[in-house]
Amino acid sequence: MAFKLGKESRGFKTPQNTNLFQKNMEDGSLAQANMDGSIDIDASININSKEAERIIKHEEAHIQQIEEGRAAYGDNWVMWEGDIYFRKEENGIAVIDGPNGRWPEGHPNHPWEAEAIAAEKINNNKE
């Protein structure tokens, strides 16, 4: 299962105004956060499921990182906290030479992914 920052460029929105689009994700990921603040989620995911809730929390964390200016991305790069890291393909696998070394896109060793994975566990219920 992979999550990753997307490769699209658009405008900005706040995480509270997140647009969600279901589509067939061609790269095998379940979802991606877009630079305009929207989230693309794979059409195979039941949008009302606990899995979708977890995925959306993960992608909203990426949107928050983008909004705060801590993260940005383009087709061939990811910016994290002011430093640029390049995307590559190695043996058919998309990797990023990030601050913690070369890891596949979506890997928890990337600090932006570690934060997003932690956000999946946050309970937002107001009981």
Residue spans for each PLM region:
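Metalloprotease/metallohydrolase-associated module, dominated by Zn2+-dependent proteases
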Residues: 7-27, 35, 73-127
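Short, surface-exposed charged micro-motifs
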Residues: 30
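Short pre-active-site segment immediately N-terminal to the catalytic Zn-binding motif
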Residues: 37-56
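Acidic glycine-/aspartate-rich tracts in secreted/extracellular proteins
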Residues: 46, 69-70
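Active-site recognition of the HExxH zinc-binding catalytic motif
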Residues: 54-67
